[in-house]
Design a protein with these regions (language model features):
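Short beta-strand/loop motif that positions the catalytic acidic residue
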Residues: 213, 219-221
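Conserved acidic catalytic loop of the alpha/beta-hydrolase fold
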Residues: 100-119
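Short, small-residue-biased leader/transition segments that mark boundaries at the very start
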Residues: 2-4
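Gly/Ala-rich beta-loop-alpha elbow adjacent to hydrolase catalytic centers
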Residues: 123-132
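Active-site nucleophile loop of the alpha/beta-hydrolase fold
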Residues: 81, 147-157
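Short alpha-helix in the alpha/beta-hydrolase fold that links the catalytic acid
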Residues: 61, 229-239
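Catalytic active-site module of serine/aspartate enzymes centered on a nucleophile-bearing elbow/loop
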Residues: 244-294
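Short, surface-exposed "cap/lid" segments of acyl-processing enzymes
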Residues: 16-73, 80-82
Length: 294
């Protein structure tokens, strides 16, 4: 963790707090919010990590988001969630947030830095897609573009995710690691078994705005995912008209498209680099929201 914080300091990343949550913030000096509003600069990015070791396990993804020479740079927000990250010394370790608090806290962070004026892009992985779904349902106009990687937020009424993550006999080294170092870790086990509101956490296809618009939404599925039934999720999304935004990666494992350097991670970041013109109803909605908040 100290190594990660040293890297953050080198990239001029600040650690701040809002309500119960610490978060990392990077604001590039050459980024201009007016350009983002006009679609001439990338939108700020909110990164929502999954279960495991928190920010350190996503070092490659976060480093890519912070920008490299010759690539567009944007503000990056990364909430640190102790109940999902082995942070057993945190006073919040056994007190995970639920949908209302999650949406309200993240909206407060976004407004604190003025990013509600242009809206944000959100990239989430695994359990992070559930927090992503809270935002989509409660702060619809604020979330301008979405990348959902290994999304466990779909089809939570089927048994695969629960069974594979908590009960299935481990048949591989990857599954063994997930079982003993993730699923049975105290904070994560407490979150999953005592504070997991299935009905609030599920995201229905009709609740995902622009679900089949490749300029607004991207969904990445790993064909050999050990947590969710990726082929089943792909078929479910296709039945609901969500085809053009889905990238299915045969043979890839859970986290493989975002935790290590690969062409799919490059694809995600390149997609986020694109400016997004805000016209018509979208900008009117954002202006209306800002006026009401004021």
């Amino acid at each position: 963790e100290m190594c990660i914080r040293d890297r953050c300091a080198r990239f001029r990343v600040r650690e701040l707090r809002c309500e119960r949550i610490r978060y990392l913030l990077y604001e590039p000096p050459d980024w201009d919010i007016e350009e983002a509003i006009n679609g001439e600069a990338p939108l700020p990015v909110l990164f929502l990590h999954g279960l495991g070791f928190g920010v350190p396990q996503y070092v490659f993804a976060i480093r890519a988001l912070l920008g490299v020479p010759g690539r567009a740079r944007r503000p990056v927000l990364v909430p640190e969630l102790p109940w999902m990250s082995h942070e057993f010394f945190s006073p919040e370790y056994l007190y995970p947030w639920q949908a209302p608090e999650a949406a309200d806290t993240i909206e407060s962070i976004v407004r604190l830095h003025g990013f509600e004026r242009c809206g944000i892009s959100v990239i989430s992985h695994s359990m992070g897609t559930i927090t992503h779904s809270f935002l989509i349902k409660r702060c619809t106009s604020m979330v301008r573009r979405s990348v959902l990687v290994d999304p466990v937020c779909f089809q939570l009424w089927v048994p695969e995710v629960c069974y594979r993550f908590l009960y299935k006999r481990a048949d591989s080294f990857v599954e063994l690691m997930l079982r003993y170092f993730v699923a049975r870790e105290l904070g994560i086990a407490n979150t999953i078994t005592r504070h997991f509101e299935w009905s609030s956490n599920v995201l229905l296809p009709n609740e995902l705005p622009n679900a089949n618009d490749p300029q607004r939404t991207r969904i990445f599925l790993a064909g050999s995912d050990t947590v969710l039934d990726a082929p089943g999720v792909q078929k479910y999304l296709a039945r609901n008209g969500i085809v053009d935004t889905v990238t299915y990666v045969p043979g890839e494992h859970h986290g493989g498209t975002i935790m290590v350097p690969n062409r799919h991670l490059d694809d995600m970041v390149s997609w986020l680099d694109e400016g997004l013109s805000m016209e018509g109803d979208a900008i009117a909605s954002l202006e209306s929201s800002s006026t009401e908040a004021a």
